[in-house]
């Protein structure tokens, strides 16, 4: 499928509990307000790419694959196509992801599948947080104790 909006995706990538929401708040204030004042409703402008909504087209192509998007060997076959099908209102869209930009090789298909490529990606921010802080943040989320 031809990409009508080359270089249209701005990626916000991170390991879970690394400050993704905080960066989304900053980006939302910059890109989605006229005055830079943050409002929590703005966070809806930056959603997770790997949510099912970006793969709705699969319902008419292959319903079994749509039902199994939680499997890496299924979803990886459709990453690029899903990105090419994205409809945007402005110049770009921002998506958050916890996925890595890597090739996934399928033995059964004898083929590599890439998460994204330079023809689709406008920019990216990769958030890196001290792993010790990630563990504490995750423990707080789960109301547990880190020893």
Where are these regions (language model features)?
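PAPS-dependent sulfotransferase catalytic domain
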Residues: 1-147
């Amino acid at each position: 499928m031809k990409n009508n909006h080359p270089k249209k995706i701005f990626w916000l990538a991170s390991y879970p509990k690394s400050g993704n929401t905080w960066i989304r708040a900053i980006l939302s204030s910059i890109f989605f307000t006229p005055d830079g004042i943050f409002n929590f409703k703005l966070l809806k402008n930056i959603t997770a790419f790997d949510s099912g909504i970006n793969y709705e087209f699969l319902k008419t192509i292959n319903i079994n694959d749509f039902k199994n998007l939680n499997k890496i060997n299924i979803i990886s076959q459709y990453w690029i196509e899903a990105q090419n099908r994205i409809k945007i209102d402005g110049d770009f869209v921002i998506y958050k992801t916890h996925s890595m930009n890597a090739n996934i090789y399928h033995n059964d298909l004898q083929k590599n599948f890439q998460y994204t490529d330079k023809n689709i990606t406008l920019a990216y921010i990769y958030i890196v947080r001290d792993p010790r802080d990630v563990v504490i943040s995750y423990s707080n989320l789960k109301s547990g104790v880190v020893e």
